């Protein structure tokens, strides 16, 4: 899948990216030569993990923490209220 314009990492320090379109489970995305396989469907406008985020660790967007993982979040997983607290 060509991942051009389907998602964005807003800041280089972010451990998340935002889906610009709805993305399907098992899609393989390329970010600067790094490949990511999505573990679940990601709705448009929602975040997914670019790296494993351990329970209690910061979820980073805009280069700053926006919340904390309430459980381990594997790379390629959807990040939302079910696994993150602000």
Model features per residue range: what roles?
Residues 1-86:
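Metallocofactor- and cofactor-centric catalytic cores in central/energy metabolism, strongly enriched
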